Amino acid sequence: MGQVLPLVTRLGDRIAIVSGLRTPFARQATAFHGIPAVDLGKMVVGELLARSEIPAEVIEQLVFGQVVQMPEAPNIAREIVLGTGMNVHTDAYSVSRACATSFQAIANVAESLMAGTIRAGIAGGADSSSVLPIGVSKKLARVLVDVNKARTMSQRLKLFSRLRLRDLMPVPPAVAEYSTGLRMGDTAEQMAKTYGITREQQDALAHRSHQRAAQAWSDGKLKEEVMTAFIPPYKQPLAEDNNIRGNSTLADYAKLRPAFDRKHGTVTAANSTPLTDGAAAVILMTESRAKELGLVPLGYLRSYAFTAIDVWQDMLLGPAWSTPLALERAGLTMSDLTLIDMHEAFAAQTLANIQLLGSERFARDVLGRAHATGEVDDSKFNVLGGSIAYGHPFAATGARMITQTLHELRRRGGGFGLVTACAAGGLGAAMVVEAE
């Protein structure tokens, strides 16, 4: 093990993660249909505070994220403060780092703690793929602005006469990268081809993810960290994630056709994470503040790293890039880890990152490092399943993973955990946490 270099405040306090909670995750247009992300965020933060029994005034900052932005609530963090009975003077702002958004929120609160500007804060994220900002065409948008400035009815009618039927069609949110036009699934297909990842390997990983997630729920391991959601019309609560296939079989995966490269592809709906609704949050404090309040932390944030690469080819390599940095900053190696939790955007992306973490050539020629980061031990990897099974509300996934990893570390008597994810725009994130 390398030299221990924990993150600490100016007074020498470690950054404590006191507690974490999430809503159940629901597939698009199912249990949370019609519930906007801001309401999901209020739901989880309100329940987190109630369960922790921490007075709301103790929380000095709330940093929250949302990837699918809603124009009517651009600062979701502030709306959560105002909608949960927190002190109105609580500092609150919103962040977005695509699928690594709650990693960023946690890092921001940690930096405030290290700077000494706060002693306690909440970080998290929420997203709804069921309540989307449906837009209008560029031509209609321009005409509507001009109509608003027109002074006479004849001027307004003349402007409207320029429109065609196609200009009136609603425009859904983009599912492709702004800079390249590539969908995430297209990038996953690139990675499968680049790194020789077969359809069978992808399906096997997806099957493993569902099996382990189903077992985690069956064993009661997730009850403490997932709240029961009561949603309109309040006829039936949602207590568990509804995407997990408890009866998953490999034969079922083989029946599906490729979703992106229809002719030669291997990426399917079943070996990809689905569009999902949900929210997750964690409470962070300085270690001394937690002791003052009589709280036993779940664990501590030891290090973190964010990286960025080119977006045109194999851009979902965030874990392979950010992991060695986070481990180096933590003074650890892969062999020191008790658990590894990697975001499963796609099975192809996950397997490619696993491959590169153990690649001497990638370390030497691409990262400029003397040795590979290290082989991923399957017995430590995504032991409770991953995003393919649980689902992926973009801004909430990081907080889910960190809370889940810390609870599992405590069940195992403590140790170090790596939590890592890829993100749109060629971004990557990794955090090392520890539990005692």
From Swiss-Prot:
Sorted alphabetically, the keyword list is: Acyltransferase, Cytoplasm, Fatty acid metabolism, Lipid degradation, Lipid metabolism, Transferase
**Pathway of action:** Lipid metabolism; fatty acid beta-oxidation
Q: Where is the active site?
A: 99, 392, 422
* Range of residues in the leader sequence: none
Question: Under which EC number(s) is this enzyme classified?
Answer: 2.3.1.16
Reaction equations catalysed: an acyl-CoA + acetyl-CoA = a 3-oxoacyl-CoA + CoA
- Tell me one GO biological process term: fatty acid beta-oxidation
Q: Quote the cellular component terms of the Gene Ontology held in the record.
A: cytosol
Q: What does this protein do?
A: Catalyzes the final step of fatty acid oxidation in which acetyl-CoA is released and the CoA ester of a fatty acid two carbons shorter is formed.
Query: NCBIfam families under this entry?
Result: AcCoA-C-Actrans, FadI, PRK08963.1
Tell me its family. Belongs to the thiolase-like superfamily. Thiolase family.
Query: Partners and quaternary state?
Result: Heterotetramer of two alpha chains (FadJ) and two beta chains (FadI).
Q: What is this protein called?
A: 3-ketoacyl-CoA thiolase
The gene from which this protein is expressed is fadI
